[in-house]
């Protein structure tokens, strides 16, 4: 079987699984960096559509200020510990992404706030009216979908699965 056929089969099998996994998650973890290069890990509820991932966060929060000065962010959605078969290999989807602020008076703001309202309820009406809350778009670039040990797949921002990562594996330490 040639590489392209393998790639198409892998895409057909994993794309629905990735979409289902993402839809089951309501929050994502954010790894941001401040102007001095200090890392910060946090989380935020999110929605996702063809434009990217979106988080509505307060300027008071450290991660929002970090995104303003350094738009490079890493995001992760991860399987709940109670659902994991193995804690050392929890299912997860991660992306390197670039953040940009969505203007309040834009059509995109209105669309995404409505989408958030459908997903999270009336709290979005209140939060979106607060001056310190900002809507960030997180545009995914390269990512990784990990299903377990030896099951890691490179994923592009538009969920295209790359077969290449399957060739790498764990190796024991040699006692030489």
Curated annotation (Swiss-Prot):
What is the catalytic activity of this protein?
Answer: heme b + 3 AH2 + 3 O2 + 2 H(+) = biliverdin IXbeta + CO + Fe(2+) + 3 A + 3 H2O; heme b + 3 AH2 + 3 O2 + 3 H(+) = biliverdin IXdelta + CO + Fe(2+) + 3 A + 3 H2O
Q: Kindly list the residues the record flags as site (Important for activity).
A: 132
Description of the deletion phenotype: Mutant is defective in heme utilization.
Note the SS bond partners: none
Write the protein's name.
Heme oxygenase HutZ
What Enzyme Commission number does this protein have?
A: 1.14.99.58
Q: State the Gene Ontology terms under molecular function.
A: coenzyme F420 binding; metal ion binding; oxidoreductase activity, acting on the CH-CH group of donors
Task: Explain what induces or represses this protein's expression.
Answer: Negatively regulated by iron.
Q: What does the record say mutating residue 132 to E does?
A: At pH 8.0, does not affect heme affinity and activity. At pH 6.0, shows a significant reduction in affinity for heme
Pfam families xrefs: PNPOx_N
Supply the gene name.
hutZ
Against InterPro entries, the record matches this protein to: F420H2_bilvrd_red/Heme_oxyg (IPR052019), HutZ (IPR014419), Pyridox_Oxase_N (IPR011576), Split_barrel_FMN-bd (IPR012349)
- Changing residue 63 to L: what effect? Cannot bind heme
Q: What is the lineage of its organism?
A: Bacteria, Pseudomonadati, Pseudomonadota, Gammaproteobacteria, Vibrionales
Q: Could you give the subunit structure recorded for this chain? A: Homodimer. Interacts with HutX, leading to the transfer of the heme from HutX to apo-HutZ.
> What domain of life does the UniProt record list for this protein's source?
Bacteria
Alphabetical UniProt keywords: Heme, Iron, Metal-binding, Oxidoreductase
Q: How is its activity regulated?
A: Activity is pH-dependent. A proximal hydrogen bond between Asp-132 and the heme axial ligant His-170 is essential for heme degradation activity. Heme-degradation reaction is inhibited by iron chelators.
Function, as annotated: Involved in heme degradation. Catalyzes the degradation of heme to biliverdin, with the release of iron. Forms biliverdin beta and delta. Binds heme with high efficiency.
- Binding-site list for heme: 170
Q: Which family does it belong to?
A: Belongs to the heme oxygenase HugZ/HutZ family.
* Enzyme superclass (EC): oxidoreductase
